Regions:
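N-terminal leader/targeting pre-sequences
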Residues: 1-126
Length: 126
């Protein structure tokens, strides 16, 4: 079992991290997005901040082994932390990608383009 992915972004600056969240229910009816299952960029904090603007493909590749996936719900989901579980969550509409940005300037108001630690871009994985 493997998953192929590509994350495209429209000219984003100050990329901090990008990852997949797995929610307990379909993303459009649950808040928050759920625990992190896979890191596209930046890795677990403190990841490196990318200062150049990214326009187009941010990340692409394959998720092949269960070791590539974080265990997002070990108590309640038998296939949590597996590639098969990630694929099932995507098919069920429970997986989303969140791209966080930060200009690393404490004087910049958060939530503006290029400085949104809460997630500048969000979308359901398909």
């Amino acid at each position: 079992t493997a998953a192929n992915y590509r994350v495209n972004v429209p000219g984003i600056a100050n990329l901090l991290i990008a990852h997949t969240h797995i929610a307990p229910a379909p993303v459009e009816v649950t808040e928050p997005a759920g625990p992190i299952a896979y890191w596209f960029s930046g890795g677990p904090p403190p990841g490196a901040n990318l200062t150049e603007r990214v326009n187009g493909t941010l990340a692409d590749g394959f998720i092949i082994t269960d070791g590539d996936v974080d265990d997002w719900d070990p108590m309640n989901t038998p296939d949590s932390g597996t590639v098969a579980g990630l694929i099932r969550a995507i098919k069920e509409g429970r997986a989303s990608v969140v791209v966080h940005t930060d200009d690393l300037d404490p004087n910049t108001p958060t939530g503006v383009a290029g400085d949104s630690r809460a997630g500048e871009l969000r979308g359901t994985l398909q």
